[in-house]
C-alpha cells in the first residue's frame, strides 16, 4: 500500500490566527512588566498607608520658593515659582509630629512642602493659590481632626491627605495583560488543534478510499 501523505501546511487564515495569538501573548507579557514598573510599585506603596486621625499643629511658609513647569500651548512650556508652605500635624497612629502632603505624587515631587499649586505662568497666581490653601488649613480646619494616611515603614515623618491609588489600579495592572495573554494562548492552541483535527480527518478519509 502506498504511504499516505497529508499536508500539514497552514492556510493563510490559520497563519494569521497564530500570528495574532503570538502577538497577544507577547503584548500581555510586556504590558505586565510595563504596568508593574509604572503603576504597581507606587500603587502598592500608596495602599500600604493606614488611615489615621490627624490634627494641625502649625501652618507656615518657610521662606523658600520652588520651580514648577507650566504649559501654555502645544509647543509652549516654561517655569515659574511658588512659595513653600508646611503643615505639620499630630498623627494619632504614632502620636508624633509629621509633615502633611496632599498625595503620594506631591510627596515624591517635593518632599519639603505640603502643597504644590497648579502651575501658572505668573508667580503671583501661584502665590495666591498657596495662600488660599494655607488660609484654608488655618481658618477652616484649625484644630479639627481629619483623616490622613500614614506609612510607618516607608516614611514615618510624612502623612498623606489622600490616596492617589486604590485596589482598582491593581486590578487593571493584572487583569488586561492576563486577558491578552490568555486570549493569545487560546487562539494559538485552538488553531493548532483545529488544524490537527482537520489533518487527521483528511488522513482517515484517504485511508477509507484508498
Swiss-Prot record:
Residues 41-167 are extracellular. GO terms for biological process: action potential; detection of calcium ion; neuronal action potential; potassium ion transport. It comes from the Eukaryota. It is a multi-pass membrane protein. One of its GO terms (cellular component) is plasma membrane. It is found in: Membrane. The chain crosses the membrane at residues 20-40, 168-188. Its main location: membrane. Glycans are attached at residues 53, 90. The keyword Transmembrane helix applies. InterPro entries: K_chnl_Ca-activ_BK_bsu. This is Calcium-activated potassium channel subunit beta-4. The gene is Kcnmb4.
Amino acid at each position: 500500500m502506498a504511504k499516505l501523505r497529508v499536508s500539514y501546511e497552514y492556510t493563510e487564515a490559520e497563519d494569521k490566527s497564530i500570528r495574532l495569538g503570538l502577538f497577544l501573548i507577547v503584548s500581555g507579557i510586556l504590558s505586565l512588566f510595563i504596568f508593574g514598573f509604572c503603576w504597581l510599585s507606587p500603587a502598592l506603596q500608596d495602599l500600604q498607608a493606614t488611615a489615621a486621625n490627624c490634627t494641625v499643629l502649625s501652618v507656615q511658609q518657610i521662606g523658600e520658593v520652588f520651580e514648577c513647569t507650566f504649559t501654555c500651548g502645544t509647543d509652549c512650556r516654561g517655569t515659574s515659582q511658588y512659595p513653600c508652605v508646611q503643615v505639620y500635624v499630630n498623627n494619632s497612629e504614632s502620636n508624633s509630629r509629621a509633615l502633611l502632603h496632599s498625595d503620594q505624587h506631591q510627596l515624591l515631587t517635593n518632599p519639603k512642602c505640603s502643597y504644590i499649586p497648579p502651575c501658572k505662568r505668573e508667580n503671583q497666581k501661584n502665590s495666591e493659590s498657596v495662600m488660599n490653601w494655607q488660609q484654608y488649613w488655618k481658618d477652616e480646619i484649625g484644630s479639627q481632626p481629619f483623616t490622613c494616611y500614614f506609612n510607618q515603614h516607608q516614611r514615618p515623618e510624612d502623612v498623606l491627605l489622600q490616596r492617589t491609588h486604590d485596589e482598582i489600579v491593581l486590578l487593571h495592572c493584572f487583569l488586561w495583560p492576563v486577558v491578552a495573554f490568555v486570549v493569545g494562548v487560546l487562539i494559538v492552541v485552538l488553531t493548532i488543534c483545529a488544524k490537527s483535527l482537520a489533518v487527521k480527518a483528511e488522513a482517515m478519509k484517504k485511508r477509507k478510499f484508498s
